[in-house]
């Protein structure tokens, strides 16, 4: 059985992944918001603040959030299920994600693991803090029947 990865190395991988996902996400956010502001002012320079906010929420903010979620799901979910067996942050640090049998996870497990990540962080990050103890599994690992180990 491979050695399980502890809290701090996994935290560093998560931090690296956050940077990798944030850069393209914020570039997209900047482009969409810039186009929206220019378009909104050009179409009606006299709109009220309420009209502007409604347009912004429907035409810029919500689509941007949807794009950012899709980027995250694809990055975390598909890379975890790929031959790399983990994200770029995990690869850089020599880690991989495996199922309970020590094999590569399925696409469903990879995507499910991303959404379980969110659940792990909802209540004061307790689902992540669990990694520091016992079997070194976070809530997302337990839910998706995965573990992170050294290559």
Curated annotation (Swiss-Prot):
Gene Ontology cellular component terms for the protein in this record: plasma membrane
Bilayer topology annotation: Multi-pass membrane protein
Keyword presence, Membrane: yes
Q: Which residues cross the membrane?
A: 12-32, 59-79, 114-134
- One short Pfam name that applies is RDD
Its keywords, alphabetically, are:
Cell membrane, Membrane, Transmembrane, Transmembrane helix
Top-rank taxon, per record: Bacteria
Subcellular location per UniProt equals: Cell membrane
Q: What is its main location?
A: membrane
InterPro entries assigned to the protein according to its UniProt record, in alphabetical order: Pra-immunoreactive (IPR051791), RDD (IPR010432)
| Transmembrane recorded as keyword | yes
Q: What is this protein called?
A: Uncharacterized protein YxaI
The uppermost taxa in this organism's lineage are: Bacteria, Bacillati, Bacillota, Bacilli, Bacillales
Gene symbol of the encoding locus: yxaI
